[in-house]
Amino acid sequence: MTKIAARLLAVLAGAAFLYALRVYPFGHGWPSWLFAALLPSYFLLLCWRPALWLFCLPALLPVLDLAPWTGWFFLEEIDLLLLLTVACGYWRLHQRPAAMRLSPAARLWLLLCSLAWLAALLRGLLPLPPWDANAYNNYLSSYNSLRLGKAWAWAMLLLPLLLRDAGHGGWRRYTLPGLLTGLSLVAGCALWERAAFPGLLNLSSDYRITAPFSAMHTGGAALDGYLALGLPFAVLWLVRARPRWHSAAALLLLALALHAALATFSRGLYAAMLAAATLGFVYAVKQLLAGMPAAQRTSQGSRTVLSLLLAAAVALALIAMFGGAGYRGLLAAVVLFSATFVLATHALPWRLAPASAVCALAIEGVLSMLWPGDVAGWLKGPYCLFLLSALLLTGALWPGMRPAGTVRLCLAMLAWTMLACNLAWIGWHWGGKPALPGAALAVLLAAVMLCNRRLHPPLWRLQRGSLSLAGAAAVLLALAIPVSASYYATERFATTAGDLQGRLRHWQGALDMMPADAASAAFGMGLGTFPATYYWHNRLGDVPASISHMEQAGERYVRLASPGYGAGYGELLRLLQRVSLRPDTAYLLALDVRRTGAMPVLQVRLCQRQLLYAQNCISAPLRLRPGDGLWQHYALPIASAWLGSGQWLLRLPVQLELAASGTAVSSVIDIDNLSLRAADGVEQIANGQFTQAGNDWFFSSDHHHLPWHIKNLALQLYIESGWCGVLSLLGLLMLASVRLLRQRSQGHANGYANVAALAAILAFLVVGLFDSLLDVPRITLLFYLLLLGALLQPSAPSPTLCHESTPP
């Protein structure tokens, strides 16, 4: 690209940014203020260090999503950042040469993908519909093609910047930390949502977390796909961490990300995690055995098998402990096994073990008899003594002290014995006699682990790698066991066969709706056309609920269409707006309603809601008069009660919900002039007259998601892009995978990073077996950037460009 062309593109992007800034709906409280402050800060960062976009975009792509506040999901906040990135990046594109390049094969496949994308985009977009109030606020619009198509367009616009900035360690220095930052933000959002709504320990609820992904308002797997992409890089950070605080931070991030992944209750994501873990395990074993003589390789293989058997036994013991003693027993068992893992790496004075055990039992017996019985909570005997034993063991083995001598090791063995006794006591206290077998199994297995140093060589040593692996395993088991044993997870796995049959029927129905002509087979029906195709042509005769903005005599209003399903009741489509309420306050709700018959019925509620699944709702006492085709005004009191209570993070978001509920035949109801005021007269509803169409309003379909998603990545590609789209992206995937595998097999210095990238791609595709991930532009763009990073290679060998700096 010439300098003049780059500057011209920068000017166009800058002009588009200024126009988007002018029309973007600011003014939605603290989210808008944060976004308004972010834009100039990001601009200054790019002026200072142009390559910082490699950090900022991966960090902000998943979380910069204000659609539930603004109602805008065609032009998103991340689009403004991308316009700013292109404008600043292309203006300075030629200040230094590109450090990376693409192979001829990569250029060819990118060209083929671009041609397939362009054909699918035009087929979905043309003929251009009128640019009215419904053009950009629903998925039935032909302009939905632009919404889905922008991911590839952004990826191609960022490619020259990637070639310039990813080299010389730029990818490793900026992009990987950006991915980890984004993952930590998403995991934090998931943790807050889980704690705020169903509760962290409430695993029987069917509540589905969405974290910051507003695209999940009609279902889909945006969170699943993002976690599939991000988790391998969290593991990579843990594997490569050098300072202790890096290892601790990586382990904490992995724990948060694993919690978010497990709390989705997504079977597809679980399968993706298993596939990625299998790939990583195979690579680690091959690295471990590489270069060993045959005899040593056999010995190492036997030790690996023995380690796996031991890990399986520990998992079974933890499962038994959780089944008998619940969360507290599980936590105690995890602590015991962790302490045993560390203690077993020392040369224990076994000749003094009987004396240590006798002393421990005596101390434990005396303390248990003297401990007061009228205390509550963690001050109860088994819990407090367990904690004291753990602290004593930690002090005896504290790594900052000089090498452990006989006295300290005897003290550690005494503390370990007390820890084991208190574990059994916790089981008895919490679960009674049924908990004792699990506790006995855990103590016996921990005692066997203490014999680690008697093996030659031992199964593990106290090293950074073994500690990281043990910590990751402890976190995984501590999180996975309660989730897998929960009622909701059990129910999900029990219905897998039936759900798969339903998914197969949906896939067949999607294929049946596709026109049987050569052009559709080659180029697809067009990007983003599936929701409209399902609405008009599904073979079941169902009519999904819809929301549209109408205009009459210069006045705009919103029209809600109730669902019409042959089987009877259908899932409602809820029109939502976030409102700021004071608790225990009387409000007056006013609105104008028009309908022509007895149906549909209008539901008006104030609910605590993040995105999906409302809770603690207060319904407005609305009783509609018989429909006569004329506007009817209603004013009714509604009390906020508990809604709006709490401070800052403890205050759950409150949303006003409107939904049309009818019979098996779809019918419509019109709404206008919505108002919600307290005695002070301050209006709580923005755009209640709908003069700005869908601004400030969002919508959700909580349970029925099939009208919006094909639910398979490959099938989505075929239906919307045809064989050209499928084969071109398949070729690009194969090329990227082969390059990553080739670098790994050649002993590349960045081998673990290549395996992490390959595992992320694999996990994303596994999630895509059961969901369509390419209908969320921000996730699709992140996936494309990862693919492009895998295709890059150094422009020319130089002393300053080593293999380690080659993406990913």
What name fits each language-model region?
Residues 2-20, 38-43, 86, 107-121, ...:
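Alpha-helical transmembrane segments of multi-pass inner-membrane proteins
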Residues 179, 591, 602-605, 633-679, ...:
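Extracellular beta-strand ligand-recognition surfaces/modules
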Residues 210, 215, 258, 542-583, ...:
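A conserved mid-to-late transmembrane alpha helix and its immediate loop/hinge
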Residues 132-141, 201-218, 368-377, 505, ...:
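Juxtamembrane membrane-water interface segments that cap and precede transmembrane helices
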Residues 87, 592-642:
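Extracellular ligand-binding interfaces
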